[in-house]
Amino acid sequence: MENQPKLNSSKEVIAFLAERFPLCFSAEGEARPLKIGIFQDLVERVQGEENLSKTQLRSALRLYTSSWRYLYGVKVGAQRVDLDGNPCGELEQQHVDHARQQLEEAKARVQAQRAEQNAKKREAAGESAAAEPRRPRPAGKKPAARREGGAAPENRKPRPQTRPQPARQPREVKEESQQRRVPVTDISKLQIGQEIKVRAGQSAMDATVLEIAKDGVRVQLSSGLAMIVRAEHLQF
């Protein structure tokens, strides 16, 4: 029992590091960029404390440096710091660009997840409304009484027979067929500045092609966010 770790999650490890090294780590607010190679410094400084393992430290560092508040702190002119808060050199431009790309992709994933969740909610609400049973007739309400004296109904002219009209296709089906889009199978046919769609669940978002790369297409959403999307998520 003595060898069991006291800190069971990466969040608990981050809270411990923020308390142990307050000039380097923070539990809330904007985070400071960390020194390159700080993992080895952590192993040497906290080895044996709280029964922390290298795996726990590595997982906590990965979670800390991928958080939005840390990525916001990686900007031009910022200084990296060591465990004691001492500056260890200014951030390079390539590191700043990489952090911005990670932040934009994370925001785009959250936006796509929200759009998919909203689509599922609307679909579930439609199914629930369609399955709702009709309300029963209120108790005590009787059908309309027949005419007194059993009088025969007035002679009425038979209605002229009308030709059956062909069933009209529902408007929703027509709109759906009109809005059906073609998936992108060859990204080499795309052009810079071309308007396309980015599929997110059952909905699609407007986007503009910024760059065609080997691993996908870099696009800019209508919200201003830029991200790299694989071909199977693109539509004309």
From Swiss-Prot:
Q: Where is this region: Disordered?
A: 105-185
* Segments passing through the bilayer: none
GO cellular component terms, A-Z: cytosol
Where primarily located?
Answer: cytoplasm
BP terms from Gene Ontology = post-transcriptional regulation of gene expression
Please provide the record's keywords in A-Z order.
Chaperone, Cytoplasm, RNA-binding
Q: Where would you find this protein in the cell?
A: Cytoplasm
SMART domains from the entry? ProQ
- A GO term, aspect molecular function: RNA strand-exchange activity
What job does this protein perform? RNA chaperone with significant RNA binding, RNA strand exchange and RNA duplexing activities. May regulate ProP activity through an RNA-based, post-transcriptional mechanism.
Hey, which family's this protein in? Belongs to the ProQ family.
HAMAP family on file = ProQ (MF_00749)
Record's protein name: RNA chaperone ProQ
The primary gene name is proQ
